[in-house]
Design a protein with these regions (language model features):
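Periplasmic N-terminal accessory/gating domains of Gram-negative outer-membrane beta-barrel systems
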Residues: 4-24, 31-152, 177-179, 192-194, ...
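Transmembrane beta-barrel strands of outer-membrane/channel proteins
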Residues: 39, 161-167, 208-212, 289-293
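Extracytoplasmic loops and strand-loop junctions of Gram-negative outer membrane beta-barrel proteins
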Residues: 55-56, 108-111, 128-130, 175-179, ...
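Transmembrane beta-barrel domains of outer membrane proteins
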Residues: 86, 130, 147-149, 196-198, ...
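Hydrophobic, lipid-facing positions within transmembrane beta-strands of outer-membrane proteins
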Residues: 123, 142-144, 189-193, 271-275, ...
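Outer-membrane beta-barrel channels and translocator barrels
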Residues: 151-153, 200-202, 282-284, 349
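Outer-membrane beta-barrel domain signature, strongest for Gram-negative TonB-dependent receptors
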Residues: 213-353
Length: 353
């Protein structure tokens, strides 16, 4: 003897919201072979311990974001301004992934590790922004904290493939009727995929995300001047003929190719990889393993401290109206971050876990 099926629709709960649903069921004479109960538990605690903003993956999909970054999503909190909260220093903000700290330990800027966004937005299930919480479990920061929960596999195989493209034609050049002039060339291409599913149904699951960003650019926009040409704008007083002489001297005497002095390609690349395994060991023990790898490559012009012009070139490094450099004098800065995290949840009794 069982009960007839009762279906309630159009009930939507926000993270942390408590809702009581009173259900009246009628008896049925049918014999039930089995009862299957499925539920999706909230990733964060339902008890608020301060000003909290929770953002689901569905909301993140609908939100406009230019940079596809955590700071874009955190703007849903009225306290947020980039990685700064309530007017505080962004370096004091704490960022966690699946409960593990993921901060910029170097401490010179509020940028996250990896030279950009260390985790793809398509790998995030939920984001929580907290400001001055009084929960003693949330520590190591002053002011604001961002907690991100990554996606995990389910009993159904699911995958996505995506690409995003942006260039200067997608950016306006007029504000309040004022023409800002010609837009400089720029482009950014992002592509990636996600895949998740069961290894053993109801027991072992996997989730993988890969994403790559490419941003073509030029670090040096100055050019050497022709004979008789004025050195103004983006034209250096260094003569093109002098650059040619130096190039030929290095090539003939030392066999060294100094590179171009008219073209300075400096493409920036960012690669992200995330892999996660979830294991339901028993009804009382669950284990999660996550691996995250981020690599960012950015090119820089020669350092301004090595200039022989008698003063430091803060804005243009060693290239500007007074001097020029060759392409092979540039250097790349590779920012690599690897992170491992393991989370074991065990419930020994109804009161001890």
């Amino acid at each position: 003897i069982g009960y007839q099926t009762v279906i309630y629709k159009d009930i939507t709960l926000q993270l942390g919201e408590v809702y009581n649903l009173n259900v009246e069921m009628s008896e049925s004479s049918e014999l039930l072979n089995e009862v299957i109960v499925t539920a999706a538990k909230t990733k964060f605690t339902a008890e608020k311990t301060g000003a909290t903003t929770n953002i689901s993956s569905a909301q993140m999909t609908q939100l406009p974001t230019v940079n596809r970054s955590i700071s874009d999503i955190a703007r849903l909190s009225p306290y947020a301004n980039g990685m700064s909260f309530a007017g505080g220093d962004g370096r004091s903000t704490n960022f966690t992934i699946d409960g593990a700290n993921f901060n910029n330990n170097f401490g010179l800027s509020s940028n996250l590790p990896g030279g950009g966004n260390p985790i793809s937005m398509d790998a995030i299930e939920e984001v929580q922004v907290v400001v001055a919480p009084f929960d003693v479990r949330q520590t190591n920061f002053i002011g604001g904290g961002i907690n991100a929960i990554t996606k995990s596999g389910t009993n159904t195989f699911r995958g996505t493939a995506y690409t995003y493209y942006r260039n200067q034609d997608m950016r306006g050049n007029r504000i309040n009727g004022e023409d800002l002039g010609a837009r400089s060339d720029e482009s950014k291409t992002t592509y990636g995929f996600t895949l998740g599913g069961p290894i053993i149904k109801n027991k072992l699951f996997f989730f993988v995300n890969y994403e790559k960003e490419k941003t073509p650019g030029e670090v040096i926009k100055y050019r050497a001047r022709e004979d008789g040409e004025d050195a103004k704008g983006m034209v250096s007083r260094t003569l093109k003929s002098d650059m040619e002489k130096v190039y030929n001297h290095l090539k003939d005497k030392y066999g060294y190719d100094a590179g171009s002095y008219t073209n300075f390609p400096a493409d920036e690349e960012n690669t992200k990889l995330l892999a996660r395994i979830d294991w339901n060991i028993t009804d009382r023990h669950r284990l999660s393993l996550r691996y995250n790898n981020t690599k960012n490559t950015a090119w820089n012009a020669p350092n301004g401290n090595s200039s022989d012009t008698g003063y430091r070139l803060n804005n243009t490094y060693r290239v500007g109206t007074q001097s020029m450099a060759f392409a092979n004098s540039m250097y790349s800065m590779d920012n690599k971050v690897q992170s491992w995290a393991a989370d074991l949840n065990s419930r020994f009794t109804d009161k001890i876990s």
